[in-house]
Amino acid sequence: MEQGQDTPWTQSTEHTNIQKRGSGQQTQRLEHPNSTRLMDHYLRIMSPVGMHKQIVYWKQWLSLKNPTQESLKTRVLKRWKLFNKQEWIN
């Protein structure tokens, strides 16, 4: 890619690299985000309790090989009911 033709993606990547350099952390060039990177991002910004709940949820989600729409619907409803019960207890 020629200079001066940065896409928003490369600009945001450069910004991230500059921030990392400024804070003294190791600099790395980011690639397009995949599910693991997005997960890492959310885990960094969430509270520890919320983070634990989300880790459990993502592990279950990623363990599904070929989910049907109905099986997903059932799973989500079960998780929602369980989550609401825990909220009321806490």
UniProtKB/Swiss-Prot annotation:
**Superkingdom of the organism of origin:** Viruses
Annotated keywords: Apoptosis, Host cytoplasm, Host membrane, Host mitochondrion, Host mitochondrion inner membrane, Host nucleus, Host-virus interaction, Inhibition of host innate immune response by virus, Inhibition of host MAVS by virus, Inhibition of host RLR pathway by virus, Membrane, Modulation of host cell apoptosis by virus, Viral immunoevasion
**What ranges does the record give for the region Mitochondrial targeting sequence, renumbered to this chain?**
65-87
Which residue stretches does the UniProt record annotate as biased composition, category Polar residues?
1-28
| Region of interest called Disordered, as start-end residue ranges on this chain | 1-34
Subcellular location per UniProt equals:
Host mitochondrion inner membrane; Host nucleus; Host cytoplasm, Host cytosol
- Where in the chain is the site Low pathogenicity? 66
What broad class describes the main subcellular location of this protein?
Answer: host cell
GO annotations under biological process?
Answer: symbiont-mediated perturbation of host apoptosis; symbiont-mediated suppression of host cytoplasmic pattern recognition receptor signaling pathway via inhibition of MAVS activity
Q: Signal peptide span per the entry? A: none
Q: What GO cellular-component annotations does this UniProt entry give?
A: host cell cytosol; host cell mitochondrial inner membrane; host cell nucleus; membrane
UniProt xrefs under InterPro entries: Flu_proapoptotic_PB1-F2
Q: Does the keyword Membrane apply?
A: yes
User: Disulphide bridges in this chain?
Assistant: none
What HAMAP family does its record include?
A: INFV_PB1F2
- Describe, as the record does, how this protein assembles with itself and its partners: Oligomer. Interacts with human SLC25A6/ANT3 and VDAC1. Interacts with host MAVS.
So what family is this one in? Belongs to the influenza viruses PB1-F2 family.
The protein's job, in short, is: Plays an important role in promoting lung pathology in both primary viral infection and secondary bacterial infection. Promotes alteration of mitochondrial morphology, dissipation of mitochondrial membrane potential, and cell death. Alternatively, inhibits the production of interferon in the infected cell at the level of host mitochondrial antiviral signaling MAVS. Its level of expression differs greatly depending on which cell type is infected, in a manner that is independent of the levels of expression of other viral proteins. Monocytic cells are more affected than epithelial cells.
Q: What else is known?
A: Is not encoded in all strains, and seems to be dispensable for replication.
Q: What is this protein called?
A: Protein PB1-F2
Organism per entry = Influenza A virus (strain A/Chicken/Shantou/4231/2003 H5N1 genotype V)
Designated gene of the protein: PB1
